[in-house]
Each structure stands twice: as structure tokens, then as C-alpha cells.
Amino acid sequence: MQPDLLSRKTAALTLQKFHTLSPLTHCMTNDVVQTFTANTLLALGASPAMVIETEEASQFAAVASALLINVGTLTQARAHAMRAAVVHAKRVKTPWTLDPVAVGSLDYRRHFCTELLSLNPDAIRGNASEIMALAGVSNSGRGVDSTDVVANALPAAVMLAQETGAVVVVTGEVDYVTDGRRTVGVGGGDPLMTKVVGTGCALSAVVAACCALPGDRLLNVASACSWMKQAGERAIVRSQGPGTFVPYFLDALWQMTQEVEA
């Protein structure tokens, strides 16, 4: 039995709330996607901050609305800073999100992400291979690319949510979002989104920001997935390929926020 799909009306109402609150989102993310991630958050009305130095990162967790940990370009120094930020975020009750990039194919980051799971993230976002590897079900995956079908990863996502208390997002042609008890699907988007570096990482930042919103975290996080897929659908109408897709995608996010505020 397939999960119910999130309604776009729910996503629009959540976007109103998001734009009003403008979450200050601390992004400890990878070097490849920082600009695109920041621009995605700005287009939706959030406030991004890229603070990575250990002493500053732990301090900033006290003032941020939400924290993102993305291990895409992980180093020992960065792992130390991320660990310190998460510990402090937990202390001051700042919600944090884990993006376990390529966790299935590299031992160092898999061990690090497993360690972070003990600090109970509020959300986890990954592709099918990453979620299955993080749950200990499989070590497949080709770097950042998924080699598994999204539906096959759903049981692992449910198990991971039950074990950690996180809302877990498995992204693909249909995104599945689960808190271990309830699961919703988010359809839409366009295959070209997989040909642009950073769309998944940017989604993780939006998921992190949505964890700062009041109300139902499952629906808030699922709404983040919906906004990104809707923007992809709008962008593909005007773009001619990956190079023109990105500016149209950011424009679409911005236009969506203007529409819900009208």
C-alpha cells in the first residue's frame, strides 16, 4: 500500500509560516554546494549562515533556528567542528538535520554519521542508498549517486526514524517522508534536477529550516520536499538544460513565496 501524497495546499500553508518566521539556518555543508544552498534558502525567505570554525560553530548553534550537518566534503577538522555544533545544539534545543552524503561507500563518514545518530537528529535526508546504509541494511551506492529504488528504502527509513526519533526523508522520483509511524509521499519534480549539483543538499538545508517551525514536523518536512519539486516543475518549462535550470529554479522558489503572501 502506497503512502498518501502530501497535498499542495498543505505545502502552501507551511510556506506561509516558513516565510513569516524566516528561520536562521546554520549550514555546515559541503564546499561544492554552499552558494546554491544559501540562494535556495534566501529565495524561500529563510536566512542562511555558513559557519564552520569549531569555536564559532558551537557558539552559533545557540542563536540559530536550525542546524544542518552535511558530510559531503568531510575532513577530520570539519568533523570535529560538526560534532561540537551538534552537541551544543542539543544542549540549547536547536533542531538539527543530518545529510549523510555518500555514507554507503566510504567508511570514515559512515562511522562518523553513525556516531552522530546517537545524538538524535530531528531529521535525516538522503537518497535510497544513503538511508539504507545509515540504517545498516546495505552498503551500496556509487559515491553521491543512489543505486537503490526509493520504495525499497522505505522500511529502512521507518526503522531509522523509530530508532532515532527523526523524521526521515528518502528522496527520488517520489520522496517518502516518515516519522516511524506515519509516512507521506511527495510527487512531482523533474529528472533534470538530478543533473544539477546540489539540489539534494539544498533540500536538506530547507528540511533543517523546516524543523524550526511549530506544528507537525512530518508535514513541515514533507512540505520542504514539495516546494523543491514544484520549483523543479516550473523551472523545466523555461530552461534549456542544466545551465539555465538553476536560475529558473531559484526564481520559481521566489515566485512561490510571493504567491502565498499575496
Swiss-Prot record:
It catalyses: 5-(2-hydroxyethyl)-4-methylthiazole + ATP = 4-methyl-5-(2-phosphooxyethyl)-thiazole + ADP + H(+). Pfam families: HK. Disulfide bonds: none annotated. Coiled coil: none annotated. Keywords: ATP-binding, Kinase, Magnesium, Metal-binding, Nucleotide-binding, Thiamine biosynthesis, Transferase. GO terms for biological process: thiamine biosynthetic process; thiamine diphosphate biosynthetic process. Substrate binds at M50, G198. Its EC number is 2.7.1.50. The keyword Magnesium applies. ATP binds at R125, T171. Belongs to the Thz kinase family. Catalyzes the phosphorylation of the hydroxyl group of 4-methyl-5-beta-hydroxyethylthiazole (THZ). This is Hydroxyethylthiazole kinase. It comes from Escherichia fergusonii (strain ATCC 35469 / DSM 13698 / CCUG 18766 / IAM 14443 / JCM 21226 / LMG 7866 / NBRC 102419 / NCTC 12128 / CDC 0568-73). The lineage of its organism: Bacteria, Pseudomonadati, Pseudomonadota, Gammaproteobacteria, Enterobacterales. The gene is thiM.
